[in-house]
């Protein structure tokens, strides 16, 4: 089973690209969704986050308040690093379990979709970076996450520069909003990775 990764800034279109790869029998693992699960009440990760950031980052049910935590980490690079140090281990363990399950089920490939793909060590056999114009990413995350422009800018600016993702990538996809061009780029990479003829 081929394991590969997709990365890029928030709002670049990683999930859209990952969905296009699914037609090749690839299972899409969204690290953000995995993180949602490890933030649930009573999980060791939620407890460790509360121990580091304080009880105010927990909701009454004991789950991690992602909005509250985001306000802290996207305004302080050291706090973002601390959160990454806590979560990468738990996300990595969860992804390993998913990989074992999907391998046993006969999946053709596993595509890990993560902003912190490089730093977390989850990249696999190949890395695909997705890029998009800054203003496009800004508008996408404002709409998707219900953020103000200031919050969205702070989030984007707290992330690695686009050059970081591109320099660590084996393949680069430019997502300027043209669905046909996006699909052509995915198809070309799928051929290079041996997912199709």
Predicted stretch roles:
Residues 6:
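Hydrophobic anchor at the beta1->P-loop junction of P-loop NTPases
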Residues 33-107:
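ATP-dependent small-molecule kinase phosphotransfer cores
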Residues 22-31, 43-44:
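Post-Walker A helix-loop "phosphate-sensing" segment adjacent to the P-loop in P-loop NTPases
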Residues 15:
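Walker A/P-loop
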Residues 96-144:
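ATP-dependent NMP and nucleoside kinases share a basic, alpha-helical "lid"
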């Amino acid at each position: 089973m081929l394991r590969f990764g997709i990365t890029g800034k928030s709002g670049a279109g990683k999930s859209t690209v990952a969905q296009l790869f699914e037609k090749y029998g690839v299972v899409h693992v969204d690290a953000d969704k995995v993180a949602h699960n490890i933030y649930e009440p009573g999980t060791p990760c939620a407890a460790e986050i509360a121990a580091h950031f304080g009880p105010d980052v927990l909701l009454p049910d004991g789950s991690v308040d992602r909005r509250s935590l985001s306000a802290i980490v996207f305004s302080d690079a050291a706090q973002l690093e601390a959160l990454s140090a806590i979560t990468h281990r738990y996300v990595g363990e969860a992804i390993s379990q998913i990989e074992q399950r999907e391998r046993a089920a006969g999946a053709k490939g596993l595509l890990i979709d993560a902003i912190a793909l490089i730093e977390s060590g989850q990249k696999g056999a190949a890395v695909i970076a997705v890029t998009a114009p800054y203003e496009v990413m800004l508008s996408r995350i404002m709409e998707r996450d219900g953020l103000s422009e200031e919050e969205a800018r702070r989030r984007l600016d707290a992330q690695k520069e686009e050059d970081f993702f591109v320099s660590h990538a084996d393949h680069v996809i430019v997502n300027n909003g043209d669905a046909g061009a996006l699909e052509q780029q995915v198809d070309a990479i799928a051929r290079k990775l041996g997912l199709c003829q």
